Amino acid sequence: MSNINQQARDVFLNLFILEMANNHWGRLDRALKIVRDHGAVARHNNVRAAIKLQFRDVDHFIHSAFKGSTNHRYIEKTEATRLTRADYARIVKEIVAVGCVPMATPFDEASVDLCVELDMRILKVASSDANDWPLLERIASTRRAVIVSTGGTSEKDLDDLVTFFENRNIPLAINHCIAIYPSDDGELELNQIDYFKQRYPGHVIGFSTHEYRDWQASMYISYAKGARTWERHIDIDHEGVAVSPYCSLPEQIDQWFKAFHKAREMCGGTQDARRVLPRREIEYLDALVRGVYAKRDLEPGYVLSGQSFKDDLYLAIPLQRGQLSCREVMNGERLVKAIVADQPLTVDHIDGPYSESRTLRDLIFNRGYAPSDDEA
């Protein structure tokens, strides 16, 4: 991730997107409860979360000849779940109040203007709109950070979209998405995360999921593969309103967040540099390293070499305090002090950096076995 610019990191890195969609069912009170319940879970798990709304200019989004249609589920649900601008403003205020980031998917140009009016920090391009160029142009004109979902989108269309936002220097994250509602485990295609990382190396890659059987396994896998933003639909079990199987309840989102923390713990630090080695690990391995012992009595002036080492010295456990190990013995080192058979070869026996440097000397004397260890 070292080639992703700092602005994109600040916006997208380890961001969870909680998609409310139309699960408010046109009721402000239900929308506010969704925000509060899921916001509390995000706060309790110490994660950065955006709660995402969907905006449509219903008066113009639906063709006049089809308004009121009950034969088209998308049209019927859009009309049935309509909220006012004032309602949306109140929801956004609540999103901020619970410590989450306000975010929206605009499905038409007028809705982009509403995003600006309500100061939505991040805009989302739905999979269905990845090549809706009038909409993309309007979204880009806001100069706001953008996340795009890629379900059902061709490679050519994705390349064009990514180039479009790159040319305008607009922060863009790319979500691997399977637009199947709900998705089974065998449909998740998580190897696509690797594909997106390789094809679009300058962007944060995410995973937008509609699975419904598990809230942990795909988090472990997607995090390990390098996804750094995630999205799920959210809802609440309240007042008998049916919950779609691809939507997650607060207790399931809690599992999801905890899986993130576990994945992060298990994967460790940066992938761009060697990890910092914990002292406990080093001390454990030092106890397994062989120390150098004399096969016979040796006098001062004796010079270590590859052949003489085989003839006159041997390696065995335990490595004792102050003793040189198989790691430190080098050709040309000279004994400055006599050593008897089966005695450990220590820092005090030879010349060289480990006897001359206080820091290196302390390193040798602070590791390995000491008789006092048996008393501890």
Model region roles, listed by residue range:
Residues 1-376:
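Catalytic cores and adjacent flexible loops of soluble metabolic enzymes
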